[in-house]
């Protein structure tokens, strides 16, 4: 199943966010390489970082997202939502059933 991770910036932690950015970026790169993240990036105003994560359960998604250095160090506040993504990248992409089957096989 896909999960949407909303990572909210905390104004009082802005300096910490900047000084820990490389560790956060490396964690994201590692998750992309492992096939756990489909998309990641900030909102245009920088208030949120958002990523779409593949996990077998909500608990697993929360545990993985909690390892993001910005979350683990209390620099950002996270919310993890179950997301039923129907299609990605193209109109003739995998069906909903195929997407769910892919998520179950991970």
Please identify what each model-predicted range represents:
Residues 1-106:
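Conserved, structured core segments of small domains
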